[in-house]
């Protein structure tokens, strides 16, 4: 989480603006989607501040689950972004393996939710 809910709101706004600018510049989808994904993370953090210390409430549990799932799928976005920064040959050679490992990581994290 950021230092405060106000900082999270500011980062959410900056990130959303950056994602929209990137989208309108017609940057690769991996760029603007990653910026948008991290803006959504800031929104989850703002929601988390609203329910902090309210353990056991539906709202707290929902925000916590959404945050956990957000983290589980982060590797897909981070690596898609990174693959846009490397030469096409390297991207084409590695993307299947990279996303397979991301999928394995997400599966392990989601499996931990099973009681």
Give the positions of each predicted feature:
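Hydrophobic alpha-helical transmembrane segments
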Residues: 16-25, 83
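Membrane-interfacial loop-to-transmembrane alpha-helix junctions, especially the N-terminal start
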Residues: 26-35, 93-98
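Hydrophobic alpha-helical transmembrane segments of multi-pass membrane proteins
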Residues: 33-49
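Mid-membrane cores of alpha-helical transmembrane segments in multi-pass membrane proteins
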Residues: 38-41, 67-77, 102
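Membrane-proximal helix-loop-helix units in multi-pass membrane proteins
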Residues: 81-115
């Amino acid at each position: 989480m950021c230092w405060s809910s106000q900082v999270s709101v500011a980062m959410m706004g900056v990130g959303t603006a950056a994602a929209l600018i990137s989208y309108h510049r017609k940057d690769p989808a991996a760029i603007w989607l990653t910026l948008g994904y991290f803006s959504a993370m800031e929104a989850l953090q703002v929601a988390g501040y609203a329910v902090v210390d309210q353990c056991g409430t539906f709202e707290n549990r929902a925000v916590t689950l959404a945050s956990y799932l957000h983290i589980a799928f982060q590797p897909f976005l981070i690596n898609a972004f990174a693959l846009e920064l490397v030469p096409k040959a390297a991207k084409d050679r590695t993307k299947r393996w990279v996303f397979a490992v991301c999928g394995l990581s997400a599966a392990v994290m989601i499996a931990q939710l099973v009681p």
